[in-house]
């Protein structure tokens, strides 16, 4: 991973410099856009963009239909991780320990009722850049996941939110606990947590 980072460092610096002009133009245009929104909706309450700051959003766990005859379920499982495994692509290499746990179905208390291991889920929460790592709570205030991305259709959400298409991608807390407990063997950390089932 370190060698990979070093190999792209120069190119990343070049791209960052090349994007600087675009970013400046976008920031100026966005300022005018927000000014226009505030003027147009001056009688209504306005909410700020997250722009890498704290923000509260809400939604529901939900799949979506990005186009005709295509439906993405709201839940992914470890089955999907194994289906995507590719030993020639570092992003899709599955560690032997995780494979062994999967083959043995050794998911402990973290598995779904049907015996599968949950990995991630999608929700209608409206997120933006800087929201990765944000806690995701249920209606009882219990941690159920950690936001880490948004779907491809959600990238334009900084301009306009489209509830039928945009989804936050959230790692299921049961998968995180499974990795801590079964994969990493660090179950002692769980003693510091209050787990609710």
Predicted regions and their residues:
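Terminal presequence/propeptide segments associated with secretion/organelle targeting
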Residues: 1-197
